Regions:
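Composition-driven recognition of glycine/serine/threonine/acidic- and proline-rich low-complexity segments
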Residues: 1-210
Length: 210
């Protein structure tokens, strides 16, 4: 939340009860609790993302699967759950971060956040899309996905890319982010002299300490 103006009250709730809250905390790294804003009269609530990027308003009527940090807020009858990966390999990201997801279902308005800009694909049945593990923001449940090792260890050592990529198959809509936070953080840390930019040297950079 960035600001509140007018006659707005705040409350705290735990969607899904204690079990649902613990799942969100352990599997997706989210808070046990969510803040509810209630309009008692005229007013406004301003929301912002946790890092530089873009915010999109999505009209939900059914179900979508989101990257764990994509969800910002919602209005209406929307349930938030932790979503398990469709394949065992989905629990591992090339950058060392778990590929954990959230499921949003119901009917209402949802606000999603992504680093950089959004890039959208409408996949037809059987159409494939291969993406970096950090670039996913949202997919429809009709899209199947799994993580696969790409091109062997040698390519990762010298190519500057991670070991794993997400293979998606339509039909369905996919939304990507052009600048994932993990990538931005590595670049900032490297520029500040406090770490290394692994995006430029892959695993080899880690081995050599670059």
């Amino acid at each position: 939340m960035m600001f509140i103006s007018g006659d707005i009250s705040m409350d705290v709730e735990m969607p899904g009860g204690l079990v649902g809250g613990i799942k969100r905390k352990l599997l997706a790294g989210e808070s046990l609790f969510l803040t509810r804003y209630l309009a008692n009269g005229a007013g406004a609530v301003g929301i912002t993302g946790p890092f530089p990027g873009s915010i999109r308003q999505h009209e939900l009527d059914g179900e979508i699967i989101c990257e764990k940090h994509a969800y910002l807020a919602h209005h209406g009858d929307v349930e938030i759950e932790s979503a398990f990966a469709q394949r065992l390999g989905m629990g591992v990201r090339g950058g060392g971060e778990g590929f954990f997801l959230q499921r949003l279902k119901g009917k209402g308005t949802v606000w999603l956040h992504g680093g950089g800009d959004f890039l959208d694909f409408d996949l037809v049945a059987g159409q494939r899309l291969i993406i970096d593990t950090g670039c996913m923001v949202m997919v429809e449940p009709t899209v199947t996905y799994e993580v696969k090792m790409q091109g062997g260890i040698a390519k990762s050592l010298f190519g500057g890319e991670g070991l794993f990529l997400v293979h998606m198959t339509g039909p369905g809509h996919v939304t990507l982010q052009t600048l994932p936070f993990s990538r931005t953080a590595r670049r900032v840390l490297a520029a500040a002299g406090g770490g290394r930019d692994e995006t430029g040297g892959g695993i080899l950079g880690s081995i050599l300490g670059e």
